[in-house]
Amino acid sequence: MFSSLLDLRVHRVYHISTWFGQVRESYRKPPTSTLVNGFGNHVGPRTSERELTYGVFGEDGKLTKLCIGRYVEFAPRLDLKSLSSCSPSAYLAFMIDIDIIRDGRTVHLLHWYQPDLVLAHKTHELVQTCSDRKGALYGAPAPPGGSSHRYVELVFQQPLNFTFPESFEHYLEPTIPARLFFNITEFAAAAELGNPVAANYFTVLGTRTSTEEQQIIEL
């Protein structure tokens, strides 16, 4: 049920991003080849150069352009040209794996949560401000060999008096058991967030020796 709710929500977000224009993200090159992801799992040297294919949606809602980026090892740099550079707002960013299977059902895993992001004037990049608010450290995609997982990225406008819901505190721990069963719909309701302002997703296919990413497809 949660997967269906999220799929519907993300489908709506793609239409929102179409109205606003291009929504794009890229990834910084990792400084070293030492690969331990945010969950403390050794990934292996060949996964350091996973390729991300992301798309640009035209006014008709169709995927019009494919570009190649690299390195999903670390948290993404979010470039949102669709948002006004004069906006005084702060933003929240999430990355969620929506294809985790547990006990025969699909559940979600929180890979990243970052509050207090603001839009840089010249670059349109969402950058972190000095803040006492905790985030959920980034955990790189590493699906089991032979399985294909979708990773959804969502950006919300942060309310002026934003308070992190106490019932979700355990999701901030950097372990897989703590991050399982995250529900973005319930979080948005508890935190009194509005609709997302931007979203994207990519698909990762896990293999025994490396992780290769597939071309983005429309929902």
Curated annotation (Swiss-Prot):
InterPro entries: PEBP (IPR008914), PEBP-like_sf (IPR036610), PEBP_euk (IPR035810)
Gene3D superfamilies: PEBP-like
Biotechnology: Phomoidrides A and B (also known as CP-225,917 and CP-263,114) are potent inhibitors of Ras farnesyltransferase and squalene synthase. CP-225,917 and CP-263,114 inhibit Ras farnesyl transferase from rat brain with IC(50) values of 6 uM and 20 uoM, respectively. CP-225,917 inhibits squalene synthase with an IC(50) value of 43 uM and CP-263,114 with an IC(50) of 160 uM.
Highest taxon in the source lineage: Eukaryota
Role, per record: Phosphatidylethanolamine-binding protein; part of the gene cluster that mediates the biosynthesis of the antihypercholesterolemic agents phomoidrides which are dimeric anhydrides. Within the pathway, phiN is not essential for dimerization and its function has still to be determined. The pathway begins with the highly reducing polyketide synthase phiA that catalyzes the formation of a C12-fatty acyl-ACP, starting from one acetate and 5 malonate units. The hydrolase phiM is involved in the release of the C12-fatty acyl chain from phiA.
Family as reported in the entry's similarity comment: Belongs to the tstN family.
Record's protein name: Phomoidride biosynthesis cluster protein N
